[in-house]
């Protein structure tokens, strides 16, 4: 019983000692005069947060998005699948089937 009381008191003492220590390697930043944010009150409801939109088509709000008219065929060579077990450029040599001249 006495041993468990000593263990609990030791844990509480150690935790109170290390409570104020910051375990970080980051540099502590100083507060400058230009960055004094104490006088600003951040509250919800500023009227300048969002500007009104013009009437008409608002994509994403009940209207369809504008279709992307890019030609997907122009990008068909961007990805070429490889056979299983061979990934050229990732530690493997590129196999060349042409005979050496």
From Swiss-Prot:
Q: Specify the inducers.
A: Triggered by nitrogen depletion.
Basic and acidic residues bias: where? 29-42, 64-79
GO annotations of cellular component type: apoplast
Q: Check the UniProt entry and state the signal peptide residues, or none.
A: 1-26
- GO molecular function list: hormone activity
Q: Which InterPro entries match?
A: CEP (IPR033250)
Q: What does this protein do?
A: Extracellular signaling peptide that represses primary root growth rate. Modulates leaf morphology. Regulates systemic nitrogen (N)-demand signaling. Mediates up-regulation of genes involved in N uptake and assimilation pathways.
Similarity-based family: Belongs to the C-terminally encoded plant signaling peptide (CEP) family.
Query: What name appears for this protein in its UniProt entry?
Result: Precursor of CEP6
From which source organism is this entry? Arabidopsis thaliana (Mouse-ear cress)
């Amino acid at each position: 019983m006495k041993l468990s009381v000593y263990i609990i008191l030791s844990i509480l003492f150690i935790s109170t000692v290390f409570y104020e220590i910051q375990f970080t390697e980051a540099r502590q930043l100083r507060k400058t005069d230009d960055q004094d944010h104490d006088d600003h009150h951040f509250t919800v409801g500023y009227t300048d947060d969002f500007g009104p939109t013009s009437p008409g088509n608002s994509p994403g709000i009940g209207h369809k998005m504008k279709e992307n008219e890019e030609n997907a065929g122009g990008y068909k060579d961007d990805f070429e699948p490889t056979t299983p077990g061979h990934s050229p450029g990732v530690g493997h040599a590129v196999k060349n089937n042409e005979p050496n001249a």
